[in-house]
Amino acid sequence: MVKKKEESGHSPLVNKKAKFNFELISFLEAGIVLSGSEVKSLRDKKGNLTDAFAKIKNGEVFLENFSIAPYKNGGYANHPEIRPRKLLLHKKEIEKLERQVKEKGLVLVATKVYFKNNLRVKVEIAVGKPKKLHDKRDDLQKKDAQQEIARALKSSNRYQ
């Protein structure tokens, strides 16, 4: 009997700018409605999440600005590169997100797209608060300080 693989062989698409531009508060996994050529293109890692965000319209959540390159062998059945893609969430989850976005002025940001059990495409969305310029500068200074400390510790351990 062949063992099933737990982890997918595909590395996820990650939005690296999300942590820099937003203070991420909570995360949520959602399914996404895609066409066949979009799934094949994502398996080839041809997606871009940099400017992707989610919007709630009429009780449904849509992922905007998520760019998936056309599949190279798609032919006439290829998909448009950028279009609103529906996210699959339970009604209570959508209502909770809608309350957070309306009351607290938070935004929904796509942070990761990955394959679950090598079959289904999932999107990790985060509820976040946009950072101001001085917050970004503070984060960069903290990161630089941590790197200096790590570098100093590494060099001091080298000579012992």
UniProtKB/Swiss-Prot annotation:
One of its GO terms (cellular component) is cytosol. InterPro entries: SmpB, SsrA-bd_prot, SsrA-bd_prot_CS. Its main location: cytoplasm. Signal peptide: none annotated. GO terms for biological process: trans-translation. It holds the Pfam family SmpB. It is found in: Cytoplasm. Keywords: Cytoplasm, RNA-binding. GO terms for molecular function: RNA binding. It comes from the Bacteria. Belongs to the SmpB family. Required for rescue of stalled ribosomes mediated by trans-translation. Binds to transfer-messenger RNA (tmRNA), required for stable association of tmRNA with ribosomes. tmRNA and SmpB together mimic tRNA shape, replacing the anticodon stem-loop with SmpB. tmRNA is encoded by the ssrA gene; the 2 termini fold to resemble tRNA(Ala) and it encodes a 'tag peptide', a short internal open reading frame. During trans-translation Ala-aminoacylated tmRNA acts like a tRNA, entering the A-site of stalled ribosomes, displacing the stalled mRNA. This is SsrA-binding protein. The lineage of its organism: Bacteria, Pseudomonadati, Spirochaetota, Spirochaetia, Leptospirales. The gene is smpB.
